[in-house]
UniProtKB/Swiss-Prot annotation:
Function: Visual pigments are the light-absorbing molecules that mediate vision. They consist of an apoprotein, opsin, covalently linked to 11-cis-retinal.
Keywords of the record: Chromophore, Disulfide bond, G-protein coupled receptor, Glycoprotein, Membrane, Phosphoprotein, Photoreceptor protein, Receptor, Retinal protein, Sensory transduction, Transducer, Transmembrane, Transmembrane helix, Vision
PTM comment text: Phosphorylated on some or all of the serine and threonine residues present in the C-terminal region.
GO molecular function, one term: photoreceptor activity
Record PROSITE patterns: G_PROTEIN_RECEP_F1_1 (PS00237), G_PROTEIN_RECEP_F1_2 (PS50262), OPSIN (PS00238)
GO cellular component terms given for this protein: membrane
Gene: UVOP
Cross-referenced InterPro entries: GPCR_opsins (IPR050125), GPCR_Rhodpsn (IPR000276), GPCR_Rhodpsn_7TM (IPR017452), Opsin (IPR001760), Retinal_BS (IPR027430)
Residues modified to N6-(retinylidene)lysine: 318
Protein name: Opsin, ultraviolet-sensitive
Cytoplasmic side: 74-84, 143-161, 231-278, 324-371
Disulfide bridges in this chain: 120-197
Principal location class: membrane
Length: 371
C-alpha cells in the first residue's frame, strides 16, 4: 500500500470509523512517515493533551534541576574539581535534552505532525546528541568513581585528562546525530503518535537493520557494560575494604579502626554502594525500553509496536533527565552546602563537612553518580 493511497483512505473514511494516524498530514510530508504508523487509528485527543502536560512537567523539573547544577558547579570554586566537570557535562546533556520538548508539546496540542519534517529533524538531532552524550558521560563518571576509589593515591583524573575525556565523549557522540540527518546512514522519522521523532527502526531494509544494530551496540550496550562493570568493581572494593578493616581491628583487639570523624560520616562506603545501585537501576530503567523497542522494530514482530506502546520509552528517557540532577548532585553534601549558601530560603540545613574527614570519605563525597 503506497503512502498516497493510505493518505487518501485516511481522509475519506466514511463517518463513524475512526480516522487513521496521519490524516491531517500534508501529502508532501507523508513520505517521511513509516507506513507502519499510518494503519493505526488516530488516538483520542485527550491522550495528546495528557502527554503534552506531562512533558511540560518534565521540562520544568529538568530545566530547574539541571540549571541549578550547572549554575552551582560553575559558580562555586570548591566544586570546580576535575571529577565535577563530568557532572556538569551530564547536566548540560539533560538540560538540552529538554530544550527540544516544545516541539513535542506543540505537536501534541495540534494532535499530530504539526511542525513537519523540519521540526522532526531538529527534535531527533538534539535527542541523539544529548541521549548518547549522557550515556557515554555516565560511563565516564563510572570510570572516574572506580579509579578514584580503587586507587585513591594515584587514580584521580587531572583537569587535562577530564577535558580530553569530554572531547572524546562528544567526538564519539556527534557522528550518530549527523549521519542520519545528512542521509549518510540511517534516517530520522516520526514515531508513535507522530509527535516525537527518533532514528528509523521500522523500514525493512538491510541498511536500516545494520544501522539499528550498530547504534544499539555503541550507544546502549557499551555504556551499559562499562557502567555495570565499574560500579560492580566499586561495590567489590568497598566490601573487601570493610572486611579487611574488621579483620585488622579484630587482630588489634579494638572495635573499629575508624576515627571519630570517620564514624560520624556514617559509613561513606555504604553510600557509594547505594549510589552505584541507584545509577545502574536508573540507566537500565530509562534506556532499556527504548533499546528493546528499536531491536523489536528492526528484527522482531513489528505488530507489538503500537503507537501507544512506543510513547512509553520516550517518556522514560525524559524522566531520567529530571532525576539525574537529584541523584548526581543534590544528594552531594558540598553541593547542598553551596546551594544553601546561595538560596538560604530553601532551608536545606546541611551541616558543614569536617576537614578531618577521611580520605575515603572525601573520595565518596565527589558527586554521587546516575538513563
Amino acid at each position: 500500500m503506497s503512502n498516497d493511497s493510505i493518505h487518501w483512505e485516511a481522509r475519506y473514511l466514511p463517518a463513524g470509523p475512526p480516522r487513521l494516524l496521519g490524516w491531517n498530514v500534508p501529502a508532501e510530508e507523508l513520505i517521511h512517515i513509516p507506513e507502519h504508523w499510518l494503519v493505526y487509528p488516530e488516538p483520542n485527543p485527550s491522550l495528546h493533551y495528557l502527554l503534552a502536560l506531562l512533558y511540560i512537567l518534565f521540562t520544568f523539573l529538568a530545566l530547574l534541576g539541571n540549571g541549578l547544577v550547572i549554575w552551582i558547579f560553575c559558580a562555586a570554586k570548591s566544586l570546580r574539581t576535575p571529577s565535577n566537570m563530568f557532572v556538569v557535562n551530564l547536566a548540560i546533556c539533560d538540560f538540552f535534552m529538554m530544550i527540544k520538548t516544545p516541539i513535542f508539546i506543540y505537536n501534541s496540542f495540534n494532535t499530530g505532525f504539526a511542525l513537519g519534517n523540519l521540526g522532526c529533524q531538529i527534535f531527533a538531532v538534539i535527542g541523539s546528541l544529548t541521549g548518547i552524550g549522557a550515556a557515554i558521560t555516565n560511563a565516564a563518571i563510572a570510570y572516574d568513581r572506580y579509579s578514584t576509589i580503587a586507587r585513591p593515591l594515584d587514580g584521580k583524573l587531572s583537569r587535562g585528562q577530564v577535558i580530553l575525556f569530554i572531547v572524546l565523549i562528544w567526538t564519539y557522540t556527534i557522528p550518530w546525530a549527523l549521519m542520519p540527518v545528512m542521509g549518510v546512514w540511517g534516517r530520522f522519522v516520526p514515531e508513535g503518535f507522530l509527535t516525537s521523532c527518533s532514528f528509523d527502526y521500522l523500514t525493512d531494509t538491510n541498511e536500516i537493520r545494520i544501522f539499528v544494530a550498530t547504534i544499539f551496540t555503541f550507544s546502549y550496550c557499551i555504556p551499559m557494560i562499562l557502567i555495570i562493570y565499574y560500579y560492580s568493581q566499586i561495590v567489590s572494593h568497598v566490601v573487601n575494604h570493610e572486611k579487611a578493616l574488621r579483620e585488622q581491628a579484630k587482630k588489634m583487639n579494638v572495635d573499629s579502626l575508624r576515627s571519630n570523624a570517620n564514624t560520624s560520616s556514617q559509613s561513606a562506603e555504604i553510600r557509594i554502594a547505594k549510589a552505584a545501585i541507584t545509577i545502574c537501576f536508573l540507566y537500565v530503567l530509562s534506556w532499556t525500553p527504548y533499546g528493546v523497542m528499536s531491536m523489536i522494530g528492526a528484527f522482531g514482530n513489528k505488530a507489538l509496536l503500537t503507537p501507544g506502546v512506543t510513547m512509553i520509552p520516550a517518556c522514560t528517557c525524559k524522566a531520567v533527565a529530571c532525576l539525574d540532577p537529584y541523584v548526581y548532585a543534590i544528594s552531594h553534601p558540598k553541593y547542598r552546602l553551596e546551594l544553601q549558601k546561595r538560596l538560604p530560603w530553601l532551608e536545606l540545613q546541611e551541616k558543614p563537612i569536617s576537614d578531618s574527614t577521611s580520605t575515603t570519605t572525601e573520595t565518596v563525597n565527589t558527586p554521587p553518580a546516575s538513563s
